[in-house]
Amino acid sequence: MERPPVQHGAVCGPWDMKDRLGTGGFGNVCLYQNRETGELKAIKSCRLELSVKNKERWCQEIQIMKRLNHPNVVKACDVPPEMDFLVNDVPHLAMEYCAGGDLRKLLNKPENCCGLKESQVLNLISDIGSGIQYLHENRIIHRDLKPENIVLQECNGKTVHKIIDLGYAKDLDQGSLCTSFVGTLQYLAPELFENKPYSVTVDYWSFGTMAFECIAGFRPFLHNMQPFTWHEKIKKKDHKHIYAYEEMSGEIRFSTSLPEPNNLCSIIVDKIETWLQLLLNWDPVQRGGGIDCGRPRCFMLMDQIFSLKIVHILNMTSAKIHSFHLQPEESLHTLQSRIERETGISTCNQELLLEMGVSLDPRKPASQCVIDGVKGWDSYMVYLFDKSKTVYEGPFQSRSLSECLNYIVQDSKVQLPIPQLRKVWAEAVHYVSGLKEDYSRLFQGQRAAMLSLLRFNTNLTKMKNTMVSASQQLDAKLQFFKRSIEIDLERYSDQMAYGISSEKMLRAWKEMEDKAVCFGKAGEIHFLDETIMGLHTEIVELQRSPCARRQGDVMEHLEQRAMELYKQLKPRSPDKAYSDSTEMVKILVQTVQGQDRVLKELFGHLSKLLGCKQKIIDLLPQIEMTVNNIKEADSSLMQMQAKRQREIWHLLKIACTQSSTRSLVTASGETPITSRTSAWSDQSSPQALFSMLTSKDKGREILRHTIDKNTDYQKLLSNLILQTQTTMEQTSLMSMDFSWLNQ
């Protein structure tokens, strides 16, 4: 007997029921929130009276869940005490709540009708593959892997996929392998479908089927048929076949390749096809590729796929994406050579920009193009520009129509069966979304060019400030130098008639004055300053231009209309056998026209950006040369100033020497010496001495002592006069060598 479902808003202690998350074969899963703490828990409760076997299976799921701990397997948690009671003789199961919903919800979105984006596919394969390995290592087979049993959770900005619903899981430690199963048939491995013995490889089949659906938007083998129908048709397929479809004639076709369209780059497609061939092998023994180094080969190949370093480069001159598998330690130059071979743009003309407008560093390896942890060309791109071009002609030819789309465009009123129309319209939605994404990527490339321009403008501003500062300093020094040399020349003229003079020095000073005028020309930066200001104005105008902002609103609106049409078609019953594509074709045509218009504007604006950037590139060497000239002029001016100061100090030394000489001569010259000599002669004549001796009665020794003392003094005075005359002759200004002035 079925238990009535829990009503929305039901209260269980502090826990309020907020939402019903899902209903399974035997249970309901509801979201509860604690009013006091805000904590969220997913509570699974039994809605049916179970048989003894199913009660065991229910309790087994709880036991399995409680012992598992892996980021890609949903965690069991403690049941709140208020809910710790039996329902239909089985307990509740409390689990972590994953707010992103399940994978089926994601796949059902119209934008994913032809598969998920590459980054989403790779992220999902990595997560679910890791979860399956963990279960198998713990000897647990899930047996019911499907999109409904994969939930999504945002964690630190990254989507994490978790496996849920282990109700059908088989614990290998609990007995022999079971041969009966009642899980979802569309994802069921052939041996389970046929009630044959099975192993862990049943999860490989389900995993491969689910991965294929995430890539293509539909299951790999005759997805429109019921399992009982396609099973007989597919069982004889080759082990490398990963895709089967029915043609209009009813003939079944097999393929070893993924169908188009999908969102994978060519490098990933090749690897994924090989990987799917291992998972979708009909033979359960061969499925997974056997064991290599203690691990199934399919997981070894997964590791190889996720270790690939792939750089995706958008050629802005052709709007084409080029993907390159980087070798370990590959240099940037080697990568550029490979780019040249594919694009025809020579390495010297290649400019590779990251999303933020930063140029790649040629000193670093090519792996700088790849961010660790980021996978998929839809999530990270490098933009290629041709430096030899400043005008990008665009727009370019839109992506080509598939055969199906071309068919309905040629005749939009042709009536097609609803199942076939769904596929054609899914391709139409993918095409419209693709045109919008093409524009978005090109706009991102234009934005990278703008950011690069702003970086160049920042360098230009710095160099301009350096130039202006150097020019102002030179001008100030020139003004000082000119004024000081004017004063020096005036003072020199004033004193040369009666003081020191030198024609060589005067000529040298006047030459300095002339050179200073020439140095002033080095500091003339008005033309460059005006040019730079004009570029600044041009850049501001480019930033303010409407083309600097996304112009894809019309395309986004058309994309939404295409998705709405597809959504309206999807639930229609096949009983309404046929319909035309008139409305969808209108959207296709309008989208192509809209893309052509916005691309014309985009490439026109991009050409202006690149032209402005080239002006800066051409201007930078001129500024650098001007700064160097100013610095050289500044240095020469300072050398002249220092030289002139040395001359002035030398003149001062001469003047001081002459002044000292004159003072000495004045103090000990002829007149004083004569007077002193006369006085001495008067006092020292023999008659006076004898008179003094007579009058004062002095002895002969006193007389001799006095005569000797005066004789010494006379010699000293004579020597001093001789030295003064010699010094004056040696320091005569007119006889000096002024050749050092020209050094």
From Swiss-Prot:
Residues 736-741 are annotated as: NEMO-binding. GO terms for molecular function: ATP binding; IkappaB kinase activity; protein heterodimerization activity; protein homodimerization activity; protein serine/threonine kinase activity. Keywords: ATP-binding, Cytoplasm, Kinase, Nucleotide-binding, Nucleus, Phosphoprotein, Serine/threonine-protein kinase, Transferase. It holds the Pfam family Pkinase. Activated when phosphorylated and inactivated when dephosphorylated. Phosphorylates inhibitors of NF-kappa-B thus leading to the dissociation of the inhibitor/NF-kappa-B complex and ultimately the degradation of the inhibitor. Phosphorylates 'Ser-10' of histone H3 at NF-kappa-B-regulated promoters during inflammatory responses triggered by cytokines. This is Inhibitor of nuclear factor kappa-B kinase subunit alpha. It comes from Xenopus laevis.
